[in-house]
Amino acid sequence: MHQLTLAEIARGLADKSFSSEELTGALLARIKQLDPQINSFISVTEDLALGQARAADARRAAGETSALLGAPIAHKDLFCTNGVRTSCGSKMLDNFKAPYDATVVAKLAEAGMVTLGKTNMDEFAMGSANESSHYGAVKNPWNLEHVPGGSSGGSAAAVAARLLPATTGTDTGGSIRQPAALTNLTGLKPTYGRVSRWGMIAYASSLDQGGPLARTAEDCALLLQGMAGFDAKDSTSIEEPVPDYSASLNASLQGLRIGLPKEYFGAGLDPRIADLVQASVKELEKLGAVVKEISLPNMQHAIPAYYVIAPAEASSNLSRFDGVRFGYRCEEPKDLTDLYKRSRGEGFGVEVQRRIMVGTYALSAGYYDAYYVKAQQIRRLIKNDFMAAFNDVDLILGPTTPNPAWKLGAKSSDPVAAYLEDVYTITANLAGLPGLSMPAGFVDGLPVGVQLLAPYFQEGRLLNVAHRYQQVTDWHTRAPNGF
């Protein structure tokens, strides 16, 4: 059963080939057997899962037919889950049990999904390798000496290892799309405001967005259907109707205009990845798409702008973790200042401390205009580039990452080298656009992804193109050895 996709599970549950309880038991056993190799879970919620599975079976027996009813899910460990540890991969929240469900968790639970656990992640979602977690690095199932990407590395590795068919992740600068690319998955970052952020512990509030990770575009469509929608509890949620994503999966690509930004194919891109991107373009042309070169001139400024804005927002968001109300508290502080300093110094890891310091500096008197305001101006220019491009094309296509997965520890001493791996993904977050990564081949036995970007709220178009591509290629069907 572990080889089944989410869509196949939905069909199997509907025709009573197996029950949710049987499926849940099989996957929990598989997690117990195989996860020690990859460390993709922080918490496994066995009792909760079996209870939810029995309830889902009862709902189905009573006549309910929802596609997600009884299907398994695991949540990135920054989605608050009532009564379950929600750690953000940090010592700071090691003992924090959320007193409520995040909207994403609640919506999927209402749809009948079964929560198998909480997945490992870079601490407070700050990282591109899933090496900064308090609970240890996650390993890439395709090669256990390599990173799975981050920050949703646990969510990606768990699906790649066939521990379950789908997971939730979050994407602040590529944290769904990049690990999806490095583990041979389909990962979708929705439009900013499409999926509620309520109960999703924030890294950078103007950039964070939750979304699905799965093996196929068909599965991402099913999961997004359950996650998306307006939420009055989230002030950044947008009241936009949610279309039937699955219904548009088989639309024709005839005449679809796809733009290839010339800036994506310069220095820094592994030429073998460039070749795989071109191969995917040829497949889409065979399906009727029309491809042309475009320009996104301000992309060159994206990384410096992002690494001012995101740390600035993080320094503000993480100021609440001070050892007073909840979270880690140091032992026997001398006074209040000592409590703050030691609780934060001992509770936060190195990468989180680095970004808090960068962000605090960027927001400080005398530097605010020089750094933060300037970064926001660049953000506007990047958004304008996309708006101009979408006057001429329907989608933008390029590599998801400049390189395949690197070895564990290879970039630990040079954080900027790791930051550069986000070069193709962060622009979508700065502009708030939807983006999708889909499997496109392998380099040295390691997976590579192709990224698609669309105008606001055109997730259906992204899923349609990815689904049609997956009907004529088999990259997404390949599984790592030993899993």
Swiss-Prot record:
Its EC number is 6.3.5.7. Pfam families: Amidase. One of its GO terms (molecular function) is glutaminyl-tRNA synthase (glutamine-hydrolyzing) activity. The active site is at 76 (charge relay system), 151 (charge relay system), 175 (acyl-ester intermediate). The keyword Nucleotidyltransferase does not apply. Belongs to the amidase family. GatA subfamily. Heterotrimer of A, B and C subunits. This is Glutamyl-tRNA(Gln) amidotransferase subunit A.
